[in-house]
């Protein structure tokens, strides 16, 4: 039978014959991942099941990124326990301190994930790696513990929704706007346990970093994963990171549960308003809403292309006196690249706070918590009530250009009007 991209990747990792959606298959995993919040839970389950070693010390990654640099005693204990486990197991890919970064930016940068891989992570945004053509999905810590021990896990073959993009991308519109538009269209449960498979001329021309931004937010529509075909751009990206991958795409006659098509030519920058990522409106309908904080970073939009986009808006301008603009490059490598390109100086000159490679405020962890009545605009991926601090605060999601323009204006602003 013809296979979707999701089915094709699952088939590569199982001895069963992958059939229609709903089938249960056992698959070998290419990488198992956890972070400083979820690893301690996985380690507890790992020990409870009596596992004595990880299945492959080179195919388990533990990244300390959420509450790091350690924000309090409890987070320090979590990191310490994870560090000791990694040493005991001889895990190669343990990252902390100056080697660590936001996990879903760090692993692609290091060449640890790529096309055709199956990646399971104890973090819901593991789906980011679908931008490289990997079947990547978040699992609970107990299931990740099993994958760490056995090197395999089970999946229910997901049905796939095909999402095609055509047209010409307007100025100040990027990948974030495309995925926000999609979530606004289908809702936060519109792809529940389904694979979102992206294609079309816009995708063909899109950078790998842009693809990862879209794949990152597949989970915000309930998706099991978000998948892009691996092409010349993908292979160039992974080859530069020491990999030797092959192109992979869905069969021409693959059967999809549903097909969607969007013309992006007239798309305006999109804003997800409180308190759901599906509450999406064009910036023209939201501009003028006062903000107190702007966050530029995260596993969604903390890569070098995102920082360039924000810096282009901030260059020669000043952050509004009533706004805290927090910039968090997602990895040390991205930080250094931004430094070399003069972006860090641009941010500092504008009055931004430039911090380390951490998830920080995205999950209300630290380095930018909101008080009662405060509003933030952020390039992050979730805006649930209380996500960035107080239950009485609000978070608006946007692309980096909009976040930067809003930081300057002191209110949600359209960068096309600056």
Curated annotation (Swiss-Prot):
Quaternary structure?
Heterodimer of LeuC and LeuD.
Protein name in UniProt: 3-isopropylmalate dehydratase large subunit
Q: In which pathway does it act?
A: Amino-acid biosynthesis; L-leucine biosynthesis; L-leucine from 3-methyl-2-oxobutanoate: step 2/4
Query: What InterPro entries does the annotation carry?
Result: Acnase/IPM_dHydase_lsu_aba_1/3, Acoase/IPM_deHydtase_lsu_aba, Aconitase_4Fe-4S_BS, Aconitase_4Fe-4S_dom, HAcnase/IPMdehydase_lsu_prok, Homoacnase/IPMdehydase_lsu, IPM_dehydratase_rel_enz, IPMI_cat
Q: What does this protein do?
A: Catalyzes the isomerization between 2-isopropylmalate and 3-isopropylmalate, via the formation of 2-isopropylmaleate.
State the UniProt keywords alphabetically. 4Fe-4S, Amino-acid biosynthesis, Branched-chain amino acid biosynthesis, Iron, Iron-sulfur, Leucine biosynthesis, Lyase, Metal-binding
Q: What is the top EC class of this enzyme, as a single word?
A: lyase
Molecular function (GO) terms for this protein are: 3-isopropylmalate dehydratase activity; 4 iron, 4 sulfur cluster binding; metal ion binding
Q: What binding details are noted for the cofactor? A: Binds 1 [4Fe-4S] cluster per subunit.
Enumerate the transmembrane spans: none
* Cross-referenced HAMAP family: LeuC_type2 (MF_01027)
EC no. given is 4.2.1.33
**What is one Gene Ontology biological process annotated in the Swiss-Prot or TrEMBL record?**
L-leucine biosynthetic process
Q: What is the similarity comment for this entry?
A: Belongs to the aconitase/IPM isomerase family. LeuC type 2 subfamily.
Organism listed in the record: Oleidesulfovibrio alaskensis (strain ATCC BAA-1058 / DSM 17464 / G20)
NCBIfam families per UniProt: hacA_fam (TIGR01343), IPMI_arch (TIGR02086), LEU2 (TIGR02083), PRK00402.1 (NF001614)
- Indicate which residues the UniProt annotation says bind [4Fe-4S] cluster: 299, 359, 362
Q: Provide the cofactor list for this protein.
A: [4Fe-4S] cluster
